[in-house]
Each structure stands twice: as structure tokens, then as C-alpha cells.
């Protein structure tokens, strides 16, 4: 009886110590203020592709992404900073196995590299996003499945590709579009101001932001669009030319096709 009591006390002490470590990690980074859904334009990102591999969606030929794809759903602070790697939670792909078709289509890796994990190793693109950002999304999310499922649903509900297409902004290696017009199209569709990130004059990412209850809100980085720190006054949505040289036009899908 005494030995059993000692064992129970030992287990309790170990559990308490582990819980204390987790609490301390969470306390070191305060709770986030809002979410940023970051979307990548493959025509810009894939232009830097020099090597192909099976996991790189830029190398899928006619099956390569033809619309904005998900980079991540990021907990952010109102001061422009963000938490990261809030607690240790090793990524387990089997937890999201039922979401794999949607993830491969809408949240693919656009690189052959293996991103670093919060634990010092290398892993998958999805694993990186969960460990760096998903672990900081508490108290909204506590598990991988709901984090990835909600991100997919937000992406499908806020179809930026279709919004731009309807406004006349289509993929082109020759056309330049007014940054203000692109921002206005998104404002009219979702009643918020996005953040736009460019590589030189090409749109690289567009970010749509949400309160913790997933109601849309302005992004912090959108508050000074007139400075155009990242993007010039006129921007492009480049087409992607695969490595084999065969031009592949990134066609804008309709809302029905995106679903």
C-alpha cells in the first residue's frame, strides 16, 4: 500500500512539473490578439524554383496551383509582432489524415526544402506551421485537426482569387495593376483592408485578418498602405513558367471550382 502511494505521488509530481513547464512557456508569450490568414501567389513564389521534387507543388505541371494557396493561419499581436513556438507539440500527420486532399490542393508546399521545427529538427511545411503558429493559437485551438480544418474553411469562404478575377485582375506577365484597385476589390468583398506583400513589383502574399471569433477585421500592416513599404504603386500577378519551359497560365477559378 505504501509503495503504491509513493508511486502515485511520484506520478503526480512528474505531471505537475510538466504542467509547470507548459504554463511557463505560455506565460513567456502573452495571448495573441488576432489571426492573419496568409495566402501565397504561386506565380511569384514558383519563379524561384530551381529544383523539383515530389512534394513541391510548383513542379506538378498542369496540376500546379492555379490560385492563391495557403501559407498559414498566424496568431499576431496588434503591435505588429507575433508569438511563435509557444509550447512543445510535435506534429502528427495522422491527426489530419482526413483533411489531406484539401491540404494538398489548397495548402501545398511550394518548396523542396524541409523547414526547421521548433524542436531543432526538420519537418514538413504543415508541421512547421503547426509548431510555430498553431501552438500559439490557444485558447481558440487546442489540437491540430481543428486548426487545419478551420484554416481550410476560412480560405474557401474568403476566395481572394475569385474576388480579383471578378474585378479584372488576372495572371499576366505583361500587365501591371494599381495596388489601390486590388486592395479596394478585397475591401468591397470582405469589408476589411488586407495586407499586401510584394517581391519587387510582383504580389507575393495577401493577408486577410480575423478576430478570434473569425469575424473579419483590418490587418495591422494595412494601416499605412500609402507608404507602400512592400509594394509599389503598380503591381503584377505573374504567370508561372514550369522548369521544362512550357508556359502554364494560372487561370482564375470560379467560386464553384474553388469548392
UniProtKB/Swiss-Prot annotation:
This is Ribonuclease 2. Most highly expressed in flowers, but also expressed in roots, stems, and leaves. Belongs to the RNase T2 family. One of its GO terms (cellular component) is vacuole. Its EC number is 4.6.1.19. It catalyses: a ribonucleotidyl-ribonucleotide-RNA + H2O = a 3'-end 3'-phospho-ribonucleotide-RNA + a 5'-end dephospho-ribonucleoside-RNA + H(+). Induction: By phosphate starvation. GO terms for biological process: negative regulation of autophagy; rRNA catabolic process. It comes from Arabidopsis thaliana (Mouse-ear cress). Residues 1-19 form the signal peptide. The gene is RNS2. May remobilize phosphate, particularly when cells senesce or when phosphate becomes limiting. GO terms for molecular function: ribonuclease T2 activity; RNA binding; RNA endonuclease activity. PROSITE patterns: RNASE_T2_1, RNASE_T2_2.
